[in-house]
């Protein structure tokens, strides 16, 4: 693009475009969240987006729900550890959240290590992932304490403030509008990923859109 200034100086400017801002709240333990996050990673390859990865916690969400089945409550105990570590990483090494989520999520979901039960169940995997992405393994110390719980709750509440407190993970904000989901059972690739994202952005821009839903009829695939 050519601009003629008032002093008759001619300059060439390339037309600039704004990146689409995406905020993605995740709990690494959730397999559906994992598939959605891998879709966003595919979108990064074909669209100009800027993603902020923010931890939330199914353990926080389900606090006080004593009516839940015992095995599910045991899973929520296990999920505290990784969520706390992500809160510490977000607060102190925010540029590493993406890499840690990719590494630990791959170990848990693609490595068929999910669904663990009881406090501390994920600590060995967390330690491996911290080392793999160049983070201090000492960050694992927060997994078994309440040291960062206030910070974790604040990150989690950031998602709830956008969509309400009766949804799980993921919560995805496209610009100023946030939704729970989308829930996918496969990871869209290439231009398919981009086209689905374009549709989501269009829905997000319509101020009176709230929900689309249907029952799931197939299981998850991560590859």
Predicted regions and their residues:
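A broad structural signal for alpha-helix termini and local helix breaks/kinks
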Residues: 2, 47, 93, 133-134, ...
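Short, Lys/Arg-enriched N-terminal segments with co-localized hydrophobic residues
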Residues: 3-17
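Local sequence-structure signature of Cys/Sec-based thiol-disulfide redox active-site neighborhoods
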Residues: 18-39
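Solvent-exposed beta-strand sheet faces enriched in polar/charged residues
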Residues: 23-25, 54, 173
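Proline-centered helix-kink/hinge sites
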Residues: 31, 55, 169-170
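Structural alpha/beta surface segment adjacent to cysteine/selenocysteine redox centers
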Residues: 34-129, 199-203, 211-214, 220-223
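C-terminal cap of thioredoxin/glutaredoxin-like
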Residues: 39-41, 117-223
């Amino acid at each position: 693009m050519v601009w003629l200034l008032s002093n008759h100086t001619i300059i060439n400017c390339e037309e600039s475009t704004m990146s689409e801002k995406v905020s993605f709240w995740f709990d690494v333990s959730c397999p559906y969240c994992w598939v959605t996050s891998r879709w966003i990673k595919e979108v990064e390859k074909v669209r100009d987006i800027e993603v902020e990865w923010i931890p939330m916690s199914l353990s926080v969400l389900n606090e006080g729900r004593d009516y839940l089945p015992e095995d599910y409550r045991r899973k929520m105990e296990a999920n505290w550890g990784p969520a706390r570590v992500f809160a510490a990483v977000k607060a102190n090494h925010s540029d590493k959240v993406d890499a840690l989520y990719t590494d630990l999520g791959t170990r848990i979901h693609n490595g068929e290590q999910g669904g663990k039960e009881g406090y501390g169940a994920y600590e060995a995997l967390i330690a491996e992932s911290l080392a793999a992405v160049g983070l201090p393994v000492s960050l694992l110390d927060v997994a078994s304490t309440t040291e960062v719980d206030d910070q974790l709750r604040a990150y989690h509440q950031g998602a709830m403030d956008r969509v309400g407190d009766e949804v799980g993970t993921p919560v995805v904000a496209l610009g100023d509008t946030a939704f729970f989901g989308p829930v996918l059972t496969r990871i869209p690739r290439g231009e398919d990923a981009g086209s689905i994202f374009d549709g989501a952005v269009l829905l997000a821009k319509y101020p009176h859109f709230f929900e689309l839903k249907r029952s799931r009829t197939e299981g998850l695939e991560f590859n």
